[in-house]
A protein has these predicted regions:
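Bacterial N-terminal signal peptides that target proteins for export
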Residues: 1-8
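Residue-level signal for mature regions of secreted extracellular proteins and peptides
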Residues: 13-14
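A short, solvent-exposed, low-complexity linear motif enriched for acidic/polar residues
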Residues: 23-257
Length: 257
């Protein structure tokens, strides 16, 4: 299947901190040097949470760019997470290890949408950066190097391996579109340059930068960053996309309006 070059261009972060403080006359504990936080992704379309359905009769209908969409599957990969402190320094989270620093987010598995980051330096953070996909130098189906992520991305309910190449799918969307429920299938990822060597051509990995509306305080109390991903931008972003049926050769043609 031809790779779509659609990239979700708008991801908005809102920050919710759960903490409490009280005045201590004489502190008895040292300030912790490491803390944890959670990045929770919430997938929406417009202002509506996305609900999946096994088939067209059970999937919820959404309107995007005047087109009806229904979703049966939504998955994508997040990796290369970095947090920027208020002093401008950057803390990288296992950026060279897909087993501990890359995640397959699966809309049908709510727990997979919560990325638990542990052993972070305590303090205040003002920005979060991450890659949508996997950067070129790590985008290889290397089971021996990253067995955990390889298995997670390749298991039956994920299927984020490309069949024709050595890299990973970055996005996998399945569902239906139009009033007559035509099949919707959007798979994105880096293109292949040479089918013999499986060399990567166009690198589709993209970095997302989120400036937090309020500093994230990592310390002894739990903290949470809620990141909202608006799938309306799939068709209704800066470039409007109109879906059309496949032609006789099995190739679809996206039409910009």
């Amino acid at each position: 299947m031809k790779n779509s070059k659609i990239v979700f261009s708008t991801i908005i972060a809102s920050l919710a901190l759960f903490s409490c403080t009280k005045k201590e006359e004489t502190p008895t504990l040292e300030t912790p040097t490491l803390g944890n936080t959670t990045l929770e992704f919430q997938n929406i379309i417009g202002s509506n949470p996305i609900e999946l359905g096994a088939d067209a009769s059970t999937a919820k209908s959404y309107i995007s760019n005047n087109q009806t969409l229904k979703f049966s599957e939504i998955k994508y990969i997040i990796s290369n997470i970095r947090l920027v402190r208020t002093d401008g320094s950057t803390i990288s989270y296992n950026v060279d290890n897909l087993d501990t620093g890359a995640f397959v987010l699966n809309q049908s598995n709510p727990e997979s949408l919560k990325l638990h980051l542990s052993d972070l330096q305590t303090g205040a953070y003002k920005e979060i950066l991450f890659d949508y996909g996997i950067r070129k130098e790590l985008n290889h189906l290397d089971e021996s190097r990253f067995p955990k992520f390889y298995k997670e991305a390749g298991k039956n309910d994920s299927r984020m391996h490309w069949e024709w190449g050595k890299g990973y799918r970055f996005t996998k969307i399945e569902g239906f579109w139009g009033n007559d429920n035509k099949v919707l299938s959007v798979h994105t990822g880096s293109t292949i340059k040479d089918r013999d060597t499986k060399a990567i051509g166009v690198d589709a990995c993209r970095t997302v930068k989120l400036v937090l509306p309020k500093n994230l305080e990592v310390g002894s109390n739990p903290s949470l960053v809620v990141i909202t991903a608006d799938f309306d931008k799939l068709l209704n972003g800066s470039q409007k996309i109109t879906l059309v049926e496949e032609d006789e050769d099995g190739e679809g043609n996206d039409v910009s309006t």
